Amino acid sequence: MDSWEDFLVEDPAKPAEFDFPLGKDSQSSSKPKKRFDDEEDEDEEENKESLQNDSHSVSQKSSSSSQNDQGSNKMTRIQQKIQERNFEKAIKASEAAAKEESLESSKEAMRQAEIDSDLANAMDLFDIVDKNSASANRSKQADQRQLKTKADYAAFQADILKKVKNCQTTAEYNNFVQDLIPLLLTGLNATNLKAVQKSVNKLVVNKEQQEKTQSKRGAAAPAAKPVSTAAPSKKGGKPTVNVNSKKTVADKSAYEDYIEDEYDDYADDFDDFM
């Protein structure tokens, strides 16, 4: 038997409810959908992964930027080292060139000092430079003194002869002449050297004849005996040589004249040479 509840009359004041499919879907969509626990865990994991990916990308960007900075800094340091090495090489090359130039200049200065010293010694020997002048200025004064005219050379020749006049008998004079003459002749040409050789050969011949004559006279001349003051004996005595006789004096004067002539010839030859 049916119940009375099945036959209840609806309240006319209450609006009737109708089922609209679209309306239900819209209402259901507006309401939050209930989610299960495993779905929430998956969403959290996805969020974590996305955050990790974002952080990883950020770290990669930062690391790449830092690597770029490090690479640029490294290249800068390499360029600086290359520049420093090139600069050091340039300094070493300059120092080597300066050292080589200083060595050459020092060698040239040493050679010039030796030349100046030799010249100063020669000037001292010939007494050409003023005695009151300082020795440091002697070479400079010698350079300033120029021999141009024949009179200048004649005066220079007179100075030389005056200087060597009293030292011809010394032991070092022979070596001095042998060392000096070749140095004086180095600036002459072959023709002038032959003329000098001719004058020297003539002087050699004259010296040989003079020495030969002196040796013959020395061997033939008898030893001088003193004049006896005792009374002559009855027997015939041996003749004696009177060194004070006119003939002996004449022979001596002739020999002296010969020596003077030879010296004059030598002086004339020397004048012609100069």
Swiss-Prot record:
Give the record's subunit note.
Component of the eukaryotic translation initiation factor 3 (eIF-3) complex. The eIF-3 complex appears to include tif32/eif3a, SPAC25G10.08/eif3b, tif33/eif3c, SPBC4C3.07/eif3f, tif35/eif3g and sum1/eif3i. This set of common subunits may also associate exclusively with either moe1/eif3d and int6/eif3e, or with SPAC821.05/eif3h and SPAC1751.03/eif3m. The eIF-3 complex may also include SPAC3A12.13c/eif3j. Interacts with sad1.
Q: Which family does this protein fall into?
A: Belongs to the eIF-3 subunit J family.
What are its GO biological-process terms? Answer: formation of cytoplasmic translation initiation complex; maturation of SSU-rRNA
- PANTHER family hit by this protein: EUKARYOTIC TRANSLATION INITIATION FACTOR 3 SUBUNIT J (PTHR21681:SF0)
Renumbered to this chain, the Basic and acidic residues biased-composition regions fall at 82-110
Composition-biased stretches, type Low complexity, lie in: 52-73, 219-234
Q: Which GO terms describe its molecular function?
A: rRNA binding; translation initiation factor activity
**Compartment(s) of residence:** Cytoplasm
**Which UniProt keywords are present, listed alphabetically?**
Cytoplasm, Initiation factor, Protein biosynthesis
Q: Which GO terms describe its cellular component?
A: eukaryotic 43S preinitiation complex; eukaryotic 48S preinitiation complex; eukaryotic translation initiation factor 3 complex; eukaryotic translation initiation factor 3 complex, eIF3m
Q: Which InterPro entries match?
A: eIF3-like_dom_sf, eIF3j
Q: Please report the name of this protein according to its UniProt entry.
A: Probable eukaryotic translation initiation factor 3 subunit J
Q: Where is the composition biased (Acidic residues)?
A: 38-47
Source organism superkingdom: Eukaryota
Region forming the signal peptide: none
